[in-house]
Amino acid sequence: MTSALRLAGTLIPAMAFLSCVRPESWEPCVEVVPNITYQCMELNFYKIPDNIPFSTKNLDLSFNPLRHLGSYSFLRFPELQVLDLSRCEIQTIEDGAYQSLSHLSTLILTGNPIQSLALGAFSGLSSLQKLVAVETNLASLENFPIGHLKTLKELNVAHNLIQSFKLPEYFSNLTNLEHLDLSSNKIQNIYCKDLQVLHQMPLPNLSLDLSLNPINFIQPGAFKEIRLHKLTLRSNFDDLNVMKTCIQGLAGLEVHRLVLGEFRNERNLEEFDKSALEGLCNLTIEEFRLTYLDYYLDNIIDLFNCLANASSFSLVSVNIKRVEDFSYNFRWQHLELVNCKFEQFPTLELESLKRLTFTANKGGNAFSEVDLPSLEFLDLSRNGLSFKGCCSQSDFGTTSLKYLDLSFNDVITMGSNFLGLEQLEHLDFQHSNLKQMSQFSVFLSLRNLIYLDISHTHTTVAFNGIFDGLLSLKVLKMAGNSFQENFLPDIFTDLKNLTFLDLSQCQLEQLSPTAFDTLNKLQVLNMSHNNFFSLDVFPYKCLPSLQVLDYSLNHIMTSKNQEPQHFPSSLAFLNLTQNDFACTCEHQSFLQWIKDQRQLLVEAERMECATPSDKQGMPVLSVNITCQMNKTIIGVSVFSVLVVSVVAVLVYKFYFHLMLLAGCIKYGRGENIYDAFVIYSSQDEDWVRNELVKNLEEGVPPFQLCLHYRDFIPGVAIAANIIHEGFHKSRKVIVVVSQHFIQSRWCIFEYEIAQTWQFLSSRAGIIFIVLQKVEKTLLRQQVELYRLLSRNTYLEWEDSVLGQHIFWRRLRKALLDGRSWNPEEQ
């Protein structure tokens, strides 16, 4: 009970203390850059936190219920440069709220329902360049106390309640102002007096955005003799007549860039006619843009005759029913046609045009030749265009072209190697369908080309000279293509200045060891999304400048032959993530290298084992492989291997002896067919036939002999016949010894088998017949035979009649030994 009371006595004061502590004193802000940038977004702060370093330069306090900013609210942050107070429910800003922020350049007050703004609210902001006061309930610029902000360059007061366009007198102090955004306010009328300050203090660099204001009237002369850098009027007019009248009210304006039209999701005009733009002839315009008009314009050329002297002309999301030739009458240097609809590709003949952007348009899918002698920049991407013979000077009518983008189009047939376009520096074909790329050296004349992208162009590289001539190329992107037999050959021979190479998604499985030998300046190489099963280091040893190598999303299990340490010393980033690493003892050295090179590898923690199954999904860095076996297991394994080896050797050496043993077991004491199996040399066959066979088989009693030339079964191995037909079916064995016998391997083999047969069979007997005198030196070569003849009796063949009589009598007696007697044989 006492301990419980003590615990309660401790917890109650602690809880009371915590309830009094403000969240800002213990909720941590996110430290983006130590001591520099802090994000304190949505932390429910009611006041400026005091636990942020004095050195902070960027502070985000958005979405906190601060509600009230008193004087010197940010005294603790004298180094502050960017302050975001978006949607902090601020209603009151007192004098000197930002005092001491002399280095602040950007202040964002978006979405605060300000009701009380003191005259000195922005005092002390001597370096402020950007002020964003969007959605702050601002009703008039007249009462906005910013006249002293002489360094201000950008003022954004969009989405407020401003009804009058009158620019206050203090604008004459804002001599550095470059951008004024008044879009989405309530301005309906513009009078001459509203712009009086711009007559007194011209701001020729000012960009003015009046979009999404419901303008009904612009007093003629209001903009007369006023110079602006940019004027934007989009989705301002409810009908065509108002638009026509207001554009006429702009008469006398000198503007560098004029933007007219609507927004994609803010359409006010129900109809459109080219007459609405006739008032443009009374303006001096350097660059003109017309955006988002869904209505088909018929014959727009005469519409823009008054813009013939402009330097830039742009149409975005405009439907054009019919267009006559863009002829030499126009002095445009830049023509932009984006996301428009054409019935056919326009005919372009513009002598002064240097830049043409014709992208994401619909209709007119077949490219037609143009005549643009001064053209340097050409973007024809995302149009679905088809080219029957690309590319040469005759296609574009220029020899000055430096930039050509034909990406995201249809079929482009390569019919020329860019004759007349030798000045090209940038060439992009990505995601177009290129034909005839590997039939000749397409880029041979492009010695000045720096950038080439042929990614995903259905190209199959079958010609090693495909990149010949690209001596200045620095960037080559060819992802998503293929190579013959999925093998990368030596195709980069001329690319000695290449620094970036992308070979991802090319289905590569192998590469030539010398594929990169000439790329001494290569810094970035992307080999990801291919089908490599091992990391071959050798091809990269010749890349002294290589810094980044990406081998992610392959099927790499281990390194190939070479040690991974042989990568160039310049390599700083190696990406091997999402591969099929084999975490087994076989690849232990490679896995250890991965752990040792953790600082070199990109996202090494994402490298996971694919095999074996029990380690699948485990991080390679943390996997632990035990590759040491138990000593007992090793000993037993070695002993087993030795035993098996010895048995195998013995079986091999005594195979036929074992066959004989198996036969003895199988046939047992079965009846013999032959009285004797004769072993002799083929060179003694005459004696065997004329003497031995004749006297024994035709004599009394007759004996049945087994002779190989007569009794062996055809189609059966000789050794099998010797064992099965000779030994197993005979009572005795007659060995005819001669010099030829001793020198014959087969005879010696049969004799050795006969010895085994005699040992295994108790009834067996070997009868030796010495056919002729054998030299002892020759006989001693067969040790066992020599010993047997020395210790046992044998028969000798003699030429005398008496000797032969005795020979046959002794031989018959030996053969009759063990034979059952049959009286019918006499």
From Swiss-Prot:
Cytoplasmic side stretches: 653-826
Alphabetized GO MF terms: lipopolysaccharide binding; lipopolysaccharide immune receptor activity; NAD+ nucleosidase activity, cyclic ADP-ribose generating; transmembrane signaling receptor activity
Gene Ontology CC: early endosome; lipopolysaccharide receptor complex; plasma membrane; ruffle
Subcellular location: Cell membrane; Early endosome; Cell projection, Ruffle
Post-translational modification: Phosphorylated on tyrosine residues by LYN after binding lipopolysaccharide. Ubiquitinated by RNF128 via 'Lys-28'-linked polyubiquitin chains, leading to proteasomal degradation.
GO biological process, one term: positive regulation of interleukin-1 beta production
Position of the signal peptide: 1-23
Nucleotidyltransferase is among the record's keywords: no
Domain named TIR: residues: 672-815
UniProt keyword terms in alphabetical order: Cell membrane, Cell projection, Disulfide bond, Endosome, Glycoprotein, Immunity, Inflammatory response, Innate immunity, Leucine-rich repeat, Membrane, NAD, Receptor, Repeat, Signal, Transmembrane, Transmembrane helix, Ubl conjugation
Pfam families per the UniProt record, alphabetical: LRR_4, LRR_6, LRR_8, TIR
Known partners and oligomeric status: Belongs to the lipopolysaccharide (LPS) receptor, a multi-protein complex containing at least CD14, LY96 and TLR4. Binding to bacterial LPS leads to homodimerization. Interacts with LY96 via the extracellular domain. Interacts with MYD88 and TIRAP via their respective TIR domains. Interacts with TICAM2. Interacts with NOX4. Interacts with CNPY3 and HSP90B1; this interaction is required for proper folding in the endoplasmic reticulum. Interacts with MAP3K21; this interaction leads to negative regulation of TLR4 signaling.
This protein's domain notes: The TIR domain mediates interaction with NOX4.
Stated role: Transmembrane receptor that functions as a pattern recognition receptor recognizing pathogen- and damage-associated molecular patterns (PAMPs and DAMPs) to induce innate immune responses via downstream signaling pathways. At the plasma membrane, cooperates with LY96 to mediate the innate immune response to bacterial lipopolysaccharide (LPS). Also involved in LPS-independent inflammatory responses triggered by free fatty acids, such as palmitate, and Ni(2+). Mechanistically, acts via MYD88, TIRAP and TRAF6, leading to NF-kappa-B activation, cytokine secretion and the inflammatory response.
Protein name: Toll-like receptor 4
Organism: Papio anubis
